[in-house]
Amino acid sequence: MKIVVPGGNGFIGSHICRLAVNAGHEVVAFGRSGEPDLLPVRHPWVGKVTWRTADVFDVDAWSDALDGADAVIHTIGTITQDPDNGVTFDRINGEAAMVAAEAAADAGVDAFVKLSVQSKPPGVSGRFLASMRRAEREIPARLPSLRTVFVQPNLVFGDDRFGTPTMAGVLQSIGRLVPFEYGSYHGRPLPVQLVAATAVQAATTATLRGALGVDQIDGIGRTSGLVEIDDLPEPTLRPLLAGIGSAALTYWTLKRLRRTSA
């Protein structure tokens, strides 16, 4: 099958591309920065992907990639806004997906898979989730020819992103003490490999459609045959967190814990 991946050079997108080409699919990926900064010697799959430099809103720059394509896996999204530079929840999480879906439908593509989220992340505006859900309602309603699937994990972690497994561990640990969606079993963090495998399965399996939450992603990813289950990373509580985002999220969870305990 031929799969087109908008945002394929990102964290989850690159894992999707890797699993898809290793499974024998033809993959074309594009993003504003083009090919990911990965050494082909260490990541031989990179050379099997056709990389394009394009903005999703400039359809003329990438629509030819849809020729003969069977599926689109849309991985573009944001949890922060920068309105001065055109980065808003509605534009990036909603309009970008609609643009890609319309182009896919016009090209006769069968399936449109969109990465989304099951619940609102801690400390993030409710407009983030609202923009996701709006796109998930409008795409199947306006483009019924597409088989649409929305892959909805919560926190996604992987060994190749330092600090992310730590944050997953913090949320999982806090969730045992103070119940909230991201720390519960049904809202648990998932390894990026399972999310990527589910996205590939969603693109290539005609019976999959609609929203796939954390439990379904876990099950589909583990039975996909695309990942080595024994090699999956586990979220851990490490002493050092990386990045301002992780520190801010940790501060938020600890404040929540103190308020609940008071």
Residue ranges and their predicted role:
Residues 92, 96-97, 163, 183-202:
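Substrate-positioning beta->alpha
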Residues 39, 43-99, 103-106:
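NAD(P)H-binding glycine-rich loop region in Rossmannoid oxidoreductase-like domains
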Residues 26, 33-34, 78, 83-137, ...:
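Conserved Rossmann-fold NAD(P)-dependent oxidoreductase catalytic core, especially the SDR/UDP-sugar
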Residues 175, 189-229:
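Alpha-helical substrate-binding/gating segment
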Residues 149-170, 176-178:
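Flexible, glycine-rich beta-alpha linker
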Residues 30-35, 56:
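N-terminal Rossmann-fold cofactor-binding loop
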Residues 233-258:
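Hydrophobic alpha-helical topogenic segments used for membrane insertion/localization
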Residues 3-25:
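N-terminal Rossmann NAD(P)H-binding glycine-rich loop of SDR-like oxidoreductase domains
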